[in-house]
Amino acid sequence: VVLKDMTQEAAEKGKAYSEPLLKKLVSRGKMLQSDSEKILNRITATSSDTDLQGCDLIIEAVFENLDLKHTITKNTESYLSNDGIWGSNTSTLPISELANAASKPDKFIGIHFFSPVDKMPLVEIIVGEKTDEETLAKAFDYAQQIRKTPIVVNDSLGFFTSRTFGTYLDEGLHLLVEGYNPIQIDNMGKAIGMPVGPLQVGDEVSLELTRKAQETWADMGVADKWSDGSVTRRVIKDMITDNGLSLIHISEPTRHVD
């Protein structure tokens, strides 16, 4: 596995994230120390694109910016093996538009992981207009090999999960600005069967990622296409100005749910 980042320091930090996860497995008797060391030794941290030469799968995972993702695709797609495929870990951007930057759009597919990746089993696989069946099969097989649960969806802005959770977050923030207790808002979300509340979703996804996605949607002329994100944008603007506090601790409630 090649882990490539902007700097060597950032790449090493990414590799180091795996160490405590493996140590926990060893301490619980679920993995031998020797196997843990073998896994870490398989990860090559680098800041050089050339180390990607010959990869069977490259997964790009930068933030939600169409131009940036296009640039990365153009600069590094050529390092794939002859039968290699390109995966974009995008949560919102249409795969068919991202694939416009690829020389082989039939080998381009969305592979959307969820945070924290080591705990969340779901992987959303998004098929673009030109994605061929072999690429879909490889992406699906890869997800199963790493013990994830893949779901296959067609290409659309936000796909299935981001459209659902985006609306969920929007509604939670509407309640927040109306003065409801943040803890009660999240408890209401869990009461209807969601694993976490909408404000916790916002915190875990991060306001910065949501902000960048909102900006990209506005640039594409599709902001508020499936829900009213005006309140979300206002809250994010205020929160980032206010040093990035947690949504759950944003303010004192003025209203309560009976």
Language-model segments: which ranges?
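N-terminal glycine-rich phosphate-binding loop for ADP-containing cofactors
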Residues: 1-251, 255
